[in-house]
């Protein structure tokens, strides 16, 4: 089990992501073959040194005469390339992300009529297909991205002078919920292609997840900056047989809120995607009775859950403790059949294992067992025991 972490302290572009993944150990021959069979280009790889850091520089050599393609033309090219299914699915989604962002910015709802400019050229096609193939080649269980340095200032493009980040890039960041920051470099450091590739593959994190670095790679950018213009990537193995997970903890104190409101809030938060909810009694200043509401959430769900807490309780604010790394067992739901009093019933059981497949725990789904208990007349505790016993025989 391993994770890939991109650390874009100098931004990211398609060729930088491709070079980084190749430097981490992706199959160079396979990636080169896929790129050159999918687009009218050739690919060269060389080692360079950027301000003291050795990196891979990927050069996509394109025909002298290039023309802008429409989004449907790009889709047809990708589908005609006979790529591996995972690579094709990733490439199509990356181009869809760019198309939807361009459409939103330009007010063009019909993607069939959408013309790509820079991102519709052969080098962008090669970057997307190559990066998708290279990242899949690394066989990572998860991919993360720390806050992206987008640069600052303005850029010149087909639509004239635009601010950094470019509107389409900013829209991709918004939709992908990636963390980003401005930098003191008066230059575009994050391209739309780079943003779309990261939005497809990566979950946002503030810091590196806990673990051991097993490989480090650098992909070189074209421009010469004051610092090293490279994209850093790190392959990390968790220091455990459990599965790494990134969560945020939301917490607030609430007084003058009835039990009925708290009970409803509990259910609402879970239905909105909270991983877990705890409501604990507390005593506040001047001896006022109150409750502490604590929620475990995915980072991308925190804002909507915090708003729900404020709206439902009247709280003036919610504390967010970000990017906490927890280790969890790998869990999946299986359905099994059990025999009770001569009748056969079906129930779900939750199976927990570590990353090496060792069984850690089996628990029967309570709601299923409750229904079986009502039908069979067998106490629910006995139904759960029998279900877990049967599951242990099947899955141990």
Swiss-Prot record:
Coiled coil region boundaries: none
GO molecular function, a single term: nickel cation binding
Domain of life (superkingdom): Archaea
Keywords of this entry: Nickel
PANTHER family per record: NICKEL INSERTION PROTEIN-RELATED, PYRIDINIUM-3,5-BISTHIOCARBOXYLIC ACID MONONUCLEOTIDE NICKEL INSERTION PROTEIN
Family from the record: Belongs to the LarC family.
NCBIfam families xref list: nickel pincer cofactor biosynthesis protein LarC
HAMAP family per UniProt: LarC (MF_01074)
Protein's name in the database: Putative nickel insertion protein
Organism: Methanosarcina mazei (strain ATCC BAA-159 / DSM 3647 / Goe1 / Go1 / JCM 11833 / OCM 88)
